[in-house]
Amino acid sequence: GDTLASNHVSSAAELSANVPNLQATSTLGENIPIFSLRGVSMSDFSVNQQSPVATYFDEVYKGSFPFIPIGLYDLERLEVLRGPQGTLYGKNTTGGAVNFISRLPQFENEGYLSLGYGNYNRMDANGALNVALGDTTAARLAFTFARRDGWFKNRVPGEPDLNQVRNYAIRGTIRTK
């Protein structure tokens, strides 16, 4: 998680440069990746197609592409398992599995905030607030925000520029002992 943050990896498609043998294409949007491991991928890109590289978020299977949108924020770690994983994860893992593990609430008060600004009026913010609610319960609220103007001018009146970014996500977690 910290390695991804220090390398400024903000979308699943950017993982290819940081994880050996993992390729990610984004034909359906920046945060809806199609993973390929060691050359095993899929050739049909219909929305109900199941990939041979399974995607999990906190060990919950994300099957069809519309249910995969993934924001890489406040992650504890990323697990990439190469090769068939049918014994561990079951179906749709002939090419491998990618498991995104988010940070769990800790039993102490802490938080962080990261802000950024870039070209094409890009603004980024992400952070988390962790609160201990007594000795046995803790809560964590994490968020991410990314906005960038498009760099292709759309000549259609009233329509936004092409390739703009508008990503917003929030995640709340409660943990008890």
What feature does the model see in each segment?
Residues 1-7, 12-18, 130:
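N-terminal Sec signal peptide and the immediately downstream disordered periplasmic leader
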Residues 1-9, 37-39, 57-58, 115-117, ...:
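Short, polar/charged loop or turn motifs at beta-strand boundaries
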Residues 4, 16, 78-83, 98-100, ...:
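Non-catalytic regulatory/gating segments with a bias toward low-complexity or hydrophobic composition
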Residues 7-10, 19, 30-32, 50-52, ...:
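Extracytoplasmic
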Residues 13, 17-60:
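Extracytoplasmic beta-strand/coil segments of soluble accessory domains associated
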Residues 45-46, 52-84:
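Short acidic/polar hinge/loop motifs at secondary-structure boundaries
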Residues 110-112, 117-177:
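Transmembrane beta-barrel wall of Gram-negative outer-membrane proteins
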